[in-house]
Amino acid sequence: MAESNKMKKMPVNKLMVQMGIPMILSMALQAVYNIVDSAFVGNMRTGSEAALNALTLVFPVQMLMVAVGIGTGVGTNALLARTLGQGNGKKAAKVAGNSLFLGVIIYAVCLLFGIFGVRAYISSQTIDTEVISMGIDYLRICCVISFGIIFFSLFEKLLQATGRSLYSTIGQIVGAVVNIILDPIMIYGIGPVPEMGVKGAAYATVIGQVASAILLFVFHMKLNREIEHDVKYMKPDSGIIKEIYAIGFPAIIAQALMSIMVYVMNLILKFSPSAQTAYGLFYKVQQFVLFLAFGLRDAITPIIAFAYGMRSKKRIQDGIRYGLLYTIVLMIPGIAITEFFPGAFATLFNAGQSREYFIEAMRIISISFLFAGINVAYQGIYQALDGGIESLVISLLRQLIIILPLAGIFSVFVRNGQMGVSLIWWAFPITEVISCLAGYVFLKRIRKNKIDVLN
């Protein structure tokens, strides 16, 4: 009741800050995993350049595993919360049980890919035998022990569905801390632990994920008393699975587009391993900045959706205004830091031969952060106002329809020696500006059809 009253009465600007800060911190924490691995790997005594390239090539598969796990979790979260609200305890238990059954299936697919598909995947992006070997080692470990990230994603959403999101954040923090502690120990070899190089980075990552998953499993079993826990509820129910993916599939697609974009960009940049590495390193820095916008978006959506349910035109308009304003405020420091201190990031990653490309990419692509952040906010606004199609179109424009053909065309001029690699980096700001203009048109249409008609 207090939560509902807060959503009704608290000034929107204060409410957005109060709801947004924990979500922003949570999203930023997710980005830490990728940056930490690359920073430690980049400072290996030997083979650091090849290892950084390998991490760049495996990243799309890591994102895809997260996409499927989170998308399944999102569908479970929404369906479970609705079912509990209806007081249907038996169905709630089936929803939770079926989500765990789906987790087992997802893990089985990842396991099979880890055993049989990794070599072909890595080899499609490079011919460097050292990079191929390191990429196979890293990705095989991440896939074979992927049950950690998969079940963490599911238990996180099961806890959020019952209002216990604090415990999922605790699990994230524990996993990040475990990863950060183990990275130098397992990569470089400290004490009785032998030097494992890129394999050590993979083991540190999956151990952190497993630690998070185990902790959230304990929280789920101990705290989610609204849900009956029994293996019998894991028996697959086609109706429930359809309901889960009716909600979760768009989230999987949105996340998977990021994975596809990075993979295709790696193919476009295949002519230059150093450019590939530079792009991969920059993408991880970019994720950290844009995840701030994603975190705020997760506050924008429920605030505007609640106001839309109340038919409160003023609170909807305030939600849009402050959502866009706060997003811009978050993006400005990100642009400033990446524009003025690219050398510091290059040193952190020990970028080596890719240093020049990395600094160039950072200075050019970071121009797009402002427009990218606004696009993310637009998507949160659309989703709150039943504009799922508009949100999907923006994702397609940003990560598929504009960026990949444009980068591909620019790469022809680069490979022919007519222009430098920097031309390819300009595809990103151009894409975000065009997408932002399209997003503004969508917002005007939604405002006219959904908001202005309210009394």
Language-model-derived ranges and their functions:
Residues 1-20, 80-147, 193-248, 304-368, ...:
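Short alpha-helical transmembrane segments in multi-pass integral membrane proteins
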Residues 7-47, 60-75, 79, 104-111, ...:
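N-terminal transmembrane alpha-helices
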Residues 18-37, 141, 175, 208-212, ...:
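Transmembrane helical elements of multi-pass membrane transporters/channels
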Residues 23, 27, 39, 78, ...:
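Transmembrane alpha-helix boundary and packing residues in multipass membrane permease domains
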Residues 28, 32-53, 122-129, 185-196, ...:
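Helix-terminus/linker motif at the lipid-water interface of multi-pass membrane proteins
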Residues 49-60, 135, 139, 273-288, ...:
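Small-residue hotspots at the loop-to-helix junctions and early N-terminal turns
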Residues 52-112, 149-168, 278-340, 372-386, ...:
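Small-residue-rich hydrophobic transmembrane alpha-helices
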Residues 73, 142-160, 168-176, 201-216, ...:
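Short runs within selected transmembrane alpha-helices of multi-pass transporters and secretion channels
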